[in-house]
């Protein structure tokens, strides 16, 4: 029993030792994990800081690139401007060179003229015979002229050139004043007058004059005829126009009625054939044709309003009385055609009433 108790105590002690060892190991593992995590966090922080620095550097580089691009654009613009200016300078230099050539040609011509003048002056000086006439504005010109003869020449030719040959400036900027002649003045004045006339009769001036005239005429119209009177005149004109249209329409209706009541061409043809066959039946055919034409005209004009019963009764009686008697030859008798005539009667109540009569030709 004692042995068992000691064994159990030893087991408990061993278990306690093992549990203490496992607890120490767990604590050490936790510490190592914490230290590792701290190191990882520090590494991550350093990485994030480096990434932020890299991003800032990238931004700085992008800004620098943009500034460089802007500078390049400015340089290109300035280069294009300088090229344009250089082209203008080249053109100006070409013009200046051409002008210089012209000036050189003029100077050469002047030199030729100067040499001619010098030769003439030398000839005159050799002859020593020339006249000098001086005109002044206020003082009248003398009648007699002074003539210099046998003038003593100076000893040196250089002194003579200085006295009689003043220095001539041959600069290209020198301007010469030439007096205009009377014809040139007249031409200028004529051109100025023509220009003034053209300006006076130009389109703009003519339009302005038209506008002013229209305004004046409108003012005069308003003074002469007031707007109320003008409106009344317009209304009266419209009324007259409407009455004229009504009259025209009534005339057209009257023409249509007359044309519809006129005898047709077929009636005339039948009448002419019957006249050729039987000249005695001329009167009957005339009445018959008139009746047929009036029937057609009455249909065009309008419906018949009233029929007289007495006339219808008389016609019926005549038709019943008149029988068809057989002829000797045994042939059936040919019935005579009915004669239809219309007699227009004008009444107070109905203006367009027509009277129908049916008569049998005997």
Curated annotation (Swiss-Prot):
Modified residues (Phosphothreonine): 334
Main localisation: cytoplasm
Pfam family, one: PTRF_SDPR
Keyword Repeat included in the entry's annotation: no
Any Gene Ontology CC annotation: sarcoplasm
Keyword annotations from UniProtKB, A to Z: Activator, Cell membrane, Coiled coil, Cytoplasm, Developmental protein, Differentiation, Membrane, Myogenesis, Phosphoprotein, Transcription, Transcription regulation
Positions of post-translational Phosphoserine modification: 152, 171-172, 353
InterPro entries (alphabetical): Cavin_fam
Entry-annotated residues carrying Phosphotyrosine: 324
GO molecular function: GTPase activator activity
Induction conditions: Up-regulated in response to cardiac hypertrophy.
Coiled coil: 100-120
Region of interest: Disordered: 1-24, 230-289, 305-346
Domain note: The coiled coil domain (residues 44-77) is essential for membrane-targeting in cardiomyocytes.
Subunit structure: Component of the CAVIN complex composed of CAVIN1, CAVIN2, CAVIN3 and CAVIN4. Interacts with CAVIN1. Interacts with CAVIN2; this augments the transactivation of NPPA. Interacts with CAV3, ADRA1A, ADRA1B, MAPK1 and MAPK3.
Similarity comment: family membership: Belongs to the CAVIN family.
Protein's recorded name: Caveolae-associated protein 4
Species for this entry: Mus musculus (Mouse)
Lineage: Eukaryota, Metazoa, Chordata, Craniata, Vertebrata
Gene: Cavin4
């Amino acid at each position: 029993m004692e042995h068992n108790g000691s064994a159990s105590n030893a087991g408990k002690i061993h278990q306690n030792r093992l549990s203490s060892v496992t607890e120490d190991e767990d604590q050490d593992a936790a510490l190592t994990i914490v230290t590792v995590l701290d190191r990882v966090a520090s590494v991550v922080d350093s990485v994030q800081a480096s990434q932020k620095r890299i991003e800032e550097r990238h931004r700085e580089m992008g800004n620098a690139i943009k500034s460089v691009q802007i500078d390049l654009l400015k340089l290109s613009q300035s280069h294009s401007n300088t090229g344009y200016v250089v082209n203008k300078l080249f053109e100006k230099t070409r013009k200046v060179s051409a002008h210089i050539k012209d000036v050189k040609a003029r100077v050469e011509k002047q030199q030729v003229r100067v040499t001619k003048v010098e030769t003439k002056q030398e000839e005159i000086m050799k002859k020593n015979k020339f006249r000098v006439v001086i005109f002044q504005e206020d003082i009248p010109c003398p009648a007699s002229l002074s003539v210099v003869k046998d003038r003593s020449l100076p000893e040196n030719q250089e002194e003579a050139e200085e006295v009689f040959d003043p220095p001539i400036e041959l600069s290209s900027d020198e301007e010469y004043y030439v007096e205009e002649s009377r014809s040139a003045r007249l031409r200028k004045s004529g051109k100025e007058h023509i220009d003034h006339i053209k300006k006076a009769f130009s389109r703009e001036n003519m339009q302005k004059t038209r506008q002013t005239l229209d305004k004046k005429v409108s003012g005069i119209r308003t003074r002469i005829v007031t707007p109320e009177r003008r409106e009344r005149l317009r209304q009266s004109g419209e009324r007259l126009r409407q009455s004229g249209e009504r009259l025209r329409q009534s005339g057209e209706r009257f023409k249509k009625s007359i044309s519809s009541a006129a005898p047709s061409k077929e009636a005339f043809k039948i009448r002419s054939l019957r006249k050729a066959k039987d000249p005695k039946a001329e009167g009957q055919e005339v009445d018959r044709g008139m009746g047929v034409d009036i029937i057609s005209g009455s249909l065009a004009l309008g419906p018949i309003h009233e029929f007289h019963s007495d006339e219808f009764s008389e016609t019926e009686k005549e038709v019943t009385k008149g029988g068809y008697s057989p002829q000797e030859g045994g042939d059936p008798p040919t019935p005579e055609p009915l004669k239809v005539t219309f007699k227009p009667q004008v009444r107070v109540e109905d203006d367009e009433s027509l009277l129908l009569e049916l008569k049998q030709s005997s």
